[in-house]
Amino acid sequence: MVQQSVEESAVSEPCLNRVGIRNCRDSLFERLVRTEREARREDFIGVLRRQGRMHPAIAAYAGAMFYADERLEPVPCPHQTEVLPGYPVPPADRLDEVLSRERVIFIPSERGGGGGRSDKVNACEARIVADLVARIRRMAGNGFSCEKTIGVIVPYRNQITMIRREMERRCPGDAPDICIDTVERFQGSQRDVIICSLTVNSDAQLGFLTANSFEENGRVIDRKLNVTLTRARRQMILTGNPEILSGSDVYAGLMERIRRDGKYMKWTL
């Protein structure tokens, strides 16, 4: 993924264009596939259909949205056969109960909430994320690991600061060691639980969030969302403003699917 627009990352040098390098946002494998297809060769692709990271209930979302042709299947690894997320400490309230049984959860947030300091923060989502981290930390008991249990994905570094501030209030001992980072820096990583604060306060920010999208075989592929949804092994939790997110067909479809197959839950702090 890249931060530049298609125009900014375009390559105009003829010598590079001749060898298939047309845009710096295109990966090596995208260039190889395009080169082979333009040469009308079809026996160059091998598709991996088994994955050992995501529980099937989580993989179903990325599979339906981005990998329908590949039909991803679990290896299966032990955690992929578990019926429930499985926290050893009993739930204390309704949200704990949801965390104990649901694999994919969406919690709607309020618009803005940065106190006028920046449009790249959302205080409501920061409180939600910190509360979720504290709950999972408590319910995981002795099995909790800052390096393995939880990761938090956000689009803006300003939001990282706000979330850490809220975490220091709710789970001060673990706050510095839990990874909170942008989706670009989360590529290649995984955690048992991924919490994503989408932090969109305007239509313009929704455009930024979905900027790394392209169309393939009539389907819109959102690179950032794809990476986000495929980082979690056991549980995926998202929070964002549904009114703004509905402006994207991809996010509107995701929220509708969560309403149907996961858990769309309002929670006020």
Where is each model-derived feature located?
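Conserved helicase motor core of SF1/SF2 NTP-dependent helicases
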Residues: M1-L269
